[in-house]
From Swiss-Prot:
Name of the protein described by the UniProt record: Crossover junction endodeoxyribonuclease RuvC
Residues holding Mg(2+) 1: D7, D138
Known role: The RuvA-RuvB-RuvC complex processes Holliday junction (HJ) DNA during genetic recombination and DNA repair. Endonuclease that resolves HJ intermediates. Cleaves cruciform DNA by making single-stranded nicks across the HJ at symmetrical positions within the homologous arms, yielding a 5'-phosphate and a 3'-hydroxyl group; requires a central core of homology in the junction. The consensus cleavage sequence is 5'-(A/T)TT(C/G)-3'. Cleavage occurs on the 3'-side of the TT dinucleotide at the point of strand exchange.
Matches recorded under InterPro entries: RNaseH-like_sf, RNaseH_sf, X-over_junc_endoDNase_Mg_BS, X-over_junc_endoDNase_RuvC
Gene Ontology cellular component annotations, sorted alphabetically: cytoplasm; Holliday junction resolvase complex
Source species taxonomy: Bacteria, Pseudomonadati, Pseudomonadota, Alphaproteobacteria, Rickettsiales
Cofactor: Mg(2+)
Annotated organism of origin: Ehrlichia canis (strain Jake)
Length: 156
């Protein structure tokens, strides 16, 4: 079974795909980046098209992402919701079931601490999968939610 974890954002949407059989293997990951000089509609369309390409490249059985939370900055929350909406629409159109988890639940399932910092989540994702990531936390956050899904569904 392959599950995609998604970390939505209008600027950067992280994604990670896990193969879950007797063990868990990371089989793909990346970031969908948009140009902030483009209109929101153009940026959302890019997220939509790139997600379709990713989904068509792997046999995805389910998807997971964090539930919406209200950020201190209302504009950030609105942009996040735009990206989430496009992801949910795209996944639904491709008949991929989406599972959502609270941020605290994801952190607790990966680190043992529901209030862990991004650095701790990143470190544990690397440790669990025996891989090393460079760059932003978008990828490790996406993989963390996919791992959380695997753990919560006892899929391995």
């Amino acid at each position: 079974m392959n599950v995609i974890g998604l970390d939505p954002g209008l600027n950067h949407t992280g994604w990670g795909i896990l193969s879950i059989e007797k063990d868990i293997k990371l089989i793909g990951n990346g970031v969908i980046k948009t140009n902030n000089k483009e209109t929101p509609g153009q940026r959302l369309n890019k997220i939509h098209k790139e997600l379709i390409n990713i989904l068509n490249s792997y046999q995805i059985n389910s998807a997971s992402m964090e539930e919406v939370f209200i950020n201190k900055n209302p504009r950030s929350s609105i942009s996040l919701c735009y990206a989430r909406g496009v992801l949910l629409l795209t996944l639904n159109a491709m008949n991929i079931q989406v599972f959502e988890y609270s941020s605290n639940y994801v952190k607790k399932s990966i680190t043992g601490n529901g209030h862990a910092k991004k650095e701790q989540v990143h470190f544990m994702v690397e440790k669990i999968l025996n891989v090393e990531f460079k760059g932003t936390y978008d990828i490790s956050d996406a993989i963390a939610v996919a791992l959380c899904h695997a753990y919560s569904k006892n899929n391995f």
